[in-house]
């Protein structure tokens, strides 16, 4: 389950991680960027209750997610920019995304649970 603050950038919520594939549990992650913020976004993450990695992308290949400034290919009609992708972890547990943009940095803590 994801507990997100509704700031400038946030993911979709309440989605369980899918069964492991190649040692990674995957979560389809759709990021929303508020119309009031048009700058770049950097998303990183890690497990916070013990050691553990997090990866991003369509497969667990990236150590971070970058949402470029300006319009996205699939911008919503209400002006929100969206960035689809995935978040991957090795084990269920407590994790956090760190979301950075120009003038802000926030942490979003979530519990990675399985289906």
Predicted feature residues:
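Contiguous segments within soluble domain cores/interaction surfaces
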Residues: 1-90, 94, 100-101, 105-115
